[in-house]
């Protein structure tokens, strides 16, 4: 399995990434929650909530491919968030990794997150996921399918998923582009942005 399996539309890529194994710096986890993001207005998947919506720049360059690259950014200037670039090379799209279940390296993840954090919450939420796996801004652009990368991804069998609106976005707030595995306690809670239109009034 390789990055070319993610050279597809972002929602299909999000489905493909659910259940994937992500490993970084002594911790291995299974992805249990993701969000899909598209790109520019004249692209195949216009998405006003995406960082790439207003075009390519130095910050979002990795979103434009090639697929399988890690796109990192800071949420509110604080928490590092990890995304997997998808779609054909040159087309903006990515999948945000929202939550994961720690499968190996729990002690190390706990040392990074804090001794009072419950096991199911170690990688719950995008910032916590990166903290648990030791993902930093320096990892931006790495090839997740390169065995020598500090953070690596392995696609597994597809899983049955539920879907709903994305968390905290004020644009395109009703799209069911957030996917999660049913019955997993590591999945984060849904919170609608206070700046989003009323339910049903957005795309």
Swiss-Prot record:
Belongs to the DNA glycosylase MPG family. Keywords: DNA damage, DNA repair, Hydrolase. Its EC number is 3.2.2.-. GO terms for biological process: base-excision repair. It comes from the Bacteria. This is Putative 3-methyladenine DNA glycosylase. The keyword DNA damage applies. It is an enzyme of class 3 (hydrolase). CDD domains: AAG (cd00540). One of its GO terms (molecular function) is alkylbase DNA N-glycosylase activity. The keyword DNA damage applies. Disulfide bonds: none annotated.
């Amino acid at each position: 399995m390789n990055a070319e399996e993610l050279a597809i539309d972002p929602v299909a890529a999000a489905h493909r990434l659910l259940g994937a194994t992500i490993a970084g710096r002594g911790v291995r986890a299974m992805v249990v929650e993701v969000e899909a993001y598209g790109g520019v207005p004249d692209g195949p998947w216009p998405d006003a909530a995406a960082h790439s919506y207003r075009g390519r720049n130095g910050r979002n360059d990795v979103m434009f491919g090639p697929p399988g690259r890690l796109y990192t950014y800071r949420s509110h200037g604080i928490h590092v968030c990890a995304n997997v670039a998808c779609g054909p090379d040159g087309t903006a799209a990515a999948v945000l990794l929202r939550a994961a279940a720690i499968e190996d390296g729990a002690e190390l993840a706990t040392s990074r997150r804090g001794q009072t954090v419950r096991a199911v919450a170690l990688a719950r939420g995008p910032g916590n996921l990166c903290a648990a796996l030791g993902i930093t801004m320096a990892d931006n652009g790495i090839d997740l399918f390169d065995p020598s990368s500090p953070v690596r991804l392995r696609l597994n069998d597809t899983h049955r998923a539920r879907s709903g609106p994305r968390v905290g976005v004020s644009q395109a707030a009703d799209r069911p582009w957030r996917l999660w595995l049913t019955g997993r306690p590591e999945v984060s809670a849904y919170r609608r942005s206070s700046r989003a239109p009323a339910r049903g009034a957005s795309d």
